[in-house]
Amino acid sequence: MVMGEITTKANVDIPQIVRDTVVEIGYDSSEKGFDGNTCAVMVALDKQSADIAMGVDKALEAKEGVDKEDDDLGAGDQGMMFGYATNETENYMPLSLDLSHRILQVLADIRREGKEMTYLRPDSKSQVTIEYDDNGTPVRIDTIVVSTQHDDFIQPADGSEAAQLKADEEMLATIRRDVINILMPRVIASIHAEKVLALFNDRITYHVNPTGKFVIGGPHGDTGLTGRKIIVDTYGGKGCLLYTSDAADD
Protein backbone atom coordinates (compact mmCIF):
# COMPACT_ATOMS: atom_id res chain seq x y z
CA MET A 1 0.00 0.00 0.00
CA VAL A 2 1.32 3.42 -1.01
CA MET A 3 -0.09 6.19 1.16
CA GLY A 4 0.71 9.83 1.71
CA GLU A 5 0.27 13.35 0.45
CA ILE A 6 2.06 14.90 -2.50
CA THR A 7 1.61 17.83 -4.84
CA THR A 8 2.92 17.38 -8.38
CA LYS A 9 2.02 17.97 -12.01
CA ALA A 10 3.79 14.77 -13.08
CA ASN A 11 1.91 11.72 -14.30
CA VAL A 12 3.54 8.79 -12.48
CA ASP A 13 2.65 5.12 -12.88
CA ILE A 14 3.03 4.35 -9.19
CA PRO A 15 1.82 0.71 -9.24
CA GLN A 16 4.36 -0.16 -11.95
CA ILE A 17 7.17 1.59 -10.08
CA VAL A 18 6.27 -0.40 -6.97
CA ARG A 19 6.21 -3.68 -8.90
CA ASP A 20 9.52 -2.97 -10.64
CA THR A 21 11.14 -2.08 -7.31
CA VAL A 22 9.91 -5.23 -5.57
CA VAL A 23 11.15 -7.41 -8.44
CA GLU A 24 14.51 -5.59 -8.53
CA ILE A 25 14.98 -6.27 -4.81
CA GLY A 26 14.50 -9.96 -5.54
CA TYR A 27 10.91 -10.82 -4.63
CA ASP A 28 9.82 -12.19 -7.98
CA SER A 29 8.22 -15.51 -7.11
CA SER A 30 5.42 -16.77 -4.89
CA GLU A 31 7.91 -19.37 -3.64
CA LYS A 32 9.69 -16.52 -1.85
CA GLY A 33 6.44 -15.47 -0.19
CA PHE A 34 6.04 -12.30 -2.27
CA ASP A 35 5.89 -11.65 -6.01
CA GLY A 36 6.14 -8.13 -7.38
CA ASN A 37 4.68 -9.29 -10.69
CA THR A 38 1.36 -10.39 -9.22
CA CYS A 39 0.99 -8.69 -5.81
CA ALA A 40 -1.83 -6.20 -5.25
CA VAL A 41 -0.71 -2.57 -5.18
CA MET A 42 -3.11 -0.18 -3.46
CA VAL A 43 -2.47 3.54 -3.94
CA ALA A 44 -4.01 6.03 -1.52
CA LEU A 45 -2.35 9.34 -2.35
CA ASP A 46 -3.91 12.74 -1.82
CA LYS A 47 -2.90 16.32 -2.46
CA GLN A 48 -0.69 17.80 0.22
CA SER A 49 -2.35 20.11 2.70
CA ALA A 50 -2.06 23.74 1.63
CA ASP A 51 -1.11 24.63 5.21
CA ILE A 52 1.83 22.20 5.18
CA ALA A 53 2.79 23.27 1.65
CA MET A 54 3.32 26.83 2.87
CA GLY A 55 6.12 25.59 5.10
CA VAL A 56 7.66 23.33 2.48
CA ASP A 57 7.60 25.71 -0.49
CA LYS A 58 9.42 28.45 1.37
CA ALA A 59 11.51 28.22 4.52
CA LEU A 60 10.90 30.43 7.53
CA GLU A 61 14.30 32.07 7.02
CA ALA A 62 13.38 32.99 3.45
CA LYS A 63 10.08 34.44 4.60
CA GLU A 64 11.94 36.58 7.11
CA GLY A 65 14.23 37.97 4.43
CA VAL A 66 17.37 35.93 5.09
CA ASP A 67 18.90 35.63 1.62
CA LYS A 68 20.39 32.13 1.69
CA GLU A 69 20.11 29.56 -1.07
CA ASP A 70 19.93 26.74 1.48
CA ASP A 71 16.81 28.30 2.96
CA ASP A 72 14.80 28.25 -0.27
CA LEU A 73 13.18 24.94 0.63
CA GLY A 74 11.42 24.57 3.96
CA ALA A 75 10.03 21.74 6.06
CA GLY A 76 6.43 20.97 6.86
CA ASP A 77 7.14 19.14 10.09
CA GLN A 78 9.84 18.16 12.54
CA GLY A 79 12.17 15.18 12.40
CA MET A 80 14.88 13.57 14.45
CA MET A 81 18.24 12.54 13.00
CA PHE A 82 21.14 10.89 14.77
CA GLY A 83 24.65 10.33 13.50
CA TYR A 84 27.99 11.95 12.85
CA ALA A 85 30.72 12.32 10.25
CA THR A 86 34.07 10.65 10.85
CA ASN A 87 37.42 10.36 9.08
CA GLU A 88 37.48 6.57 9.61
CA THR A 89 36.28 6.08 6.02
CA GLU A 90 36.46 7.95 2.71
CA ASN A 91 32.69 8.50 2.74
CA TYR A 92 32.81 9.92 6.29
CA MET A 93 30.50 7.22 7.63
CA PRO A 94 31.44 5.27 10.78
CA LEU A 95 33.59 2.28 9.87
CA SER A 96 31.24 -0.27 11.40
CA LEU A 97 28.32 1.00 9.34
CA ASP A 98 30.43 1.18 6.19
CA LEU A 99 31.55 -2.44 6.59
CA SER A 100 27.99 -3.60 7.35
CA HIS A 101 26.75 -1.95 4.17
CA ARG A 102 29.66 -3.38 2.17
CA ILE A 103 28.95 -6.92 3.39
CA LEU A 104 25.28 -6.67 2.43
CA GLN A 105 26.07 -5.13 -0.97
CA VAL A 106 28.47 -7.94 -1.87
CA LEU A 107 25.97 -10.50 -0.58
CA ALA A 108 23.31 -8.98 -2.85
CA ASP A 109 25.76 -9.03 -5.78
CA ILE A 110 26.41 -12.74 -5.23
CA ARG A 111 22.67 -13.44 -5.10
CA ARG A 112 21.96 -11.53 -8.29
CA GLU A 113 24.85 -13.17 -10.16
CA GLY A 114 23.30 -16.56 -9.40
CA LYS A 115 26.56 -18.53 -9.69
CA GLU A 116 27.42 -19.14 -6.04
CA MET A 117 25.32 -19.36 -2.90
CA THR A 118 22.33 -19.92 -5.17
CA TYR A 119 20.08 -20.53 -2.18
CA LEU A 120 20.17 -16.84 -1.15
CA ARG A 121 16.98 -14.81 -0.82
CA PRO A 122 16.79 -11.00 -0.54
CA ASP A 123 16.17 -10.42 3.18
CA SER A 124 19.46 -9.96 5.04
CA LYS A 125 21.22 -7.88 7.65
CA SER A 126 24.70 -7.50 9.07
CA GLN A 127 26.35 -6.13 12.18
CA VAL A 128 30.02 -5.38 12.70
CA THR A 129 31.62 -4.85 16.11
CA ILE A 130 34.93 -3.01 16.19
CA GLU A 131 37.42 -2.62 19.03
CA TYR A 132 38.90 0.83 19.57
CA ASP A 133 41.93 1.93 21.57
CA ASP A 134 41.92 4.66 24.22
CA ASN A 135 42.44 7.28 21.52
CA GLY A 136 39.31 6.24 19.63
CA THR A 137 41.26 4.56 16.83
CA PRO A 138 39.97 1.25 15.39
CA VAL A 139 42.40 -1.56 16.21
CA ARG A 140 40.60 -4.72 15.07
CA ILE A 141 37.29 -6.20 13.99
CA ASP A 142 35.92 -8.21 16.88
CA THR A 143 32.67 -9.72 15.56
CA ILE A 144 30.77 -9.96 12.28
CA VAL A 145 27.13 -11.01 12.17
CA VAL A 146 25.48 -12.01 8.90
CA SER A 147 21.85 -13.11 8.80
CA THR A 148 20.46 -14.00 5.40
CA GLN A 149 17.22 -15.45 4.15
CA HIS A 150 17.62 -18.65 2.14
CA ASP A 151 15.82 -21.40 0.27
CA ASP A 152 14.89 -24.60 2.06
CA PHE A 153 17.67 -26.18 0.00
CA ILE A 154 18.24 -29.35 2.04
CA GLN A 155 15.20 -31.53 2.59
CA PRO A 156 14.85 -33.92 5.55
CA ALA A 157 15.21 -37.64 4.89
CA ASP A 158 11.79 -38.29 6.42
CA GLY A 159 9.05 -36.50 8.31
CA SER A 160 10.59 -36.91 11.75
CA GLU A 161 11.65 -34.01 13.94
CA ALA A 162 15.18 -35.42 14.12
CA ALA A 163 15.47 -35.51 10.32
CA GLN A 164 14.25 -31.92 10.05
CA LEU A 165 16.74 -30.80 12.69
CA LYS A 166 19.57 -32.55 10.84
CA ALA A 167 18.59 -30.88 7.55
CA ASP A 168 18.45 -27.46 9.24
CA GLU A 169 21.88 -27.98 10.79
CA GLU A 170 23.35 -28.96 7.41
CA MET A 171 21.88 -25.86 5.79
CA LEU A 172 23.28 -23.63 8.52
CA ALA A 173 26.72 -25.24 8.22
CA THR A 174 26.71 -24.68 4.45
CA ILE A 175 25.69 -21.03 4.78
CA ARG A 176 28.33 -20.39 7.45
CA ARG A 177 31.05 -22.00 5.31
CA ASP A 178 30.01 -19.98 2.26
CA VAL A 179 29.89 -16.70 4.20
CA ILE A 180 33.45 -17.23 5.43
CA ASN A 181 34.92 -18.74 2.24
CA ILE A 182 32.95 -16.94 -0.51
CA LEU A 183 31.38 -13.76 0.84
CA MET A 184 34.09 -12.41 3.11
CA PRO A 185 37.01 -12.81 0.64
CA ARG A 186 35.03 -10.75 -1.88
CA VAL A 187 34.24 -8.16 0.77
CA ILE A 188 37.91 -7.88 1.72
CA ALA A 189 38.93 -7.70 -1.95
CA SER A 190 36.62 -4.71 -2.41
CA ILE A 191 38.45 -2.73 0.30
CA HIS A 192 41.45 -0.65 -0.78
CA ALA A 193 42.28 1.29 2.38
CA GLU A 194 45.28 -0.37 4.03
CA LYS A 195 44.27 0.80 7.50
CA VAL A 196 40.92 -0.98 7.12
CA LEU A 197 42.43 -4.16 5.66
CA ALA A 198 44.75 -4.33 8.67
CA LEU A 199 41.71 -4.71 10.97
CA PHE A 200 40.83 -8.15 9.56
CA ASN A 201 42.40 -11.05 11.43
CA ASP A 202 41.99 -14.72 12.29
CA ARG A 203 40.40 -13.86 15.64
CA ILE A 204 37.19 -12.45 14.19
CA THR A 205 34.10 -14.16 15.60
CA TYR A 206 31.47 -14.92 12.95
CA HIS A 207 27.79 -15.33 13.81
CA VAL A 208 25.97 -16.59 10.72
CA ASN A 209 22.19 -16.91 10.98
CA PRO A 210 22.58 -17.17 14.77
CA THR A 211 18.85 -17.72 15.32
CA GLY A 212 18.84 -20.73 12.98
CA LYS A 213 16.85 -21.40 9.81
CA PHE A 214 15.78 -18.23 7.97
CA VAL A 215 13.45 -19.32 5.15
CA ILE A 216 10.48 -17.09 5.94
CA GLY A 217 11.47 -13.45 5.55
CA GLY A 218 10.90 -10.20 3.71
CA PRO A 219 7.37 -8.77 3.48
CA HIS A 220 5.92 -12.24 4.04
CA GLY A 221 7.66 -12.65 7.39
CA ASP A 222 7.75 -9.15 8.86
CA THR A 223 5.78 -5.97 8.25
CA GLY A 224 8.60 -3.84 9.65
CA LEU A 225 8.48 -0.44 11.30
CA THR A 226 9.91 1.90 8.66
CA GLY A 227 7.70 4.96 8.29
CA ARG A 228 5.80 4.20 11.48
CA LYS A 229 8.19 5.43 14.14
CA ILE A 230 10.11 8.59 14.95
CA ILE A 231 13.53 6.97 15.08
CA VAL A 232 14.98 3.49 15.34
CA ASP A 233 17.66 3.29 12.64
CA THR A 234 20.81 5.11 13.66
CA TYR A 235 24.48 5.22 12.88
CA GLY A 236 27.23 6.30 15.21
CA GLY A 237 26.59 6.03 18.93
CA LYS A 238 30.11 4.85 19.71
CA GLY A 239 30.57 3.31 23.14
CA CYS A 240 33.80 2.93 25.11
CA LEU A 241 35.69 0.07 23.45
CA LEU A 242 33.13 -1.79 21.40
CA TYR A 243 31.00 -0.02 18.83
CA THR A 244 28.31 -1.75 16.79
CA SER A 245 26.10 -0.78 13.92
CA ASP A 246 23.75 -2.75 11.70
CA ALA A 247 22.18 -2.37 8.27
CA ALA A 248 19.56 -4.03 6.08
CA ASP A 249 19.59 -4.91 2.38
CA ASP A 250 17.50 -2.90 0.02
Cite the ranges covered by each PLM segment:
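Histidine-centered divalent-metal-coordination microenvironment in nucleic-acid enzymes
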Residues: M1, V145, R228-I231
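Short, charge-patterned binding micro-sites
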Residues: M1-T8
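Histidine- and/or cysteine-centered catalytic micro-motif in compact active-site loops
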Residues: E5, T211, P219, Y235-G237
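A glycine-rich helix N-cap at a beta->alpha junction
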Residues: R19-S30
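Glycine-rich, mobile lid/loop segments that gate access to catalytic sites or pores
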Residues: Y27, G36-I216
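A glycine-rich, aromatic-flanked flexible loop/lid motif
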Residues: T223-L242
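Conserved small/polar residues in nucleotide/adenosyl-binding loops
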Residues: Y243-A248
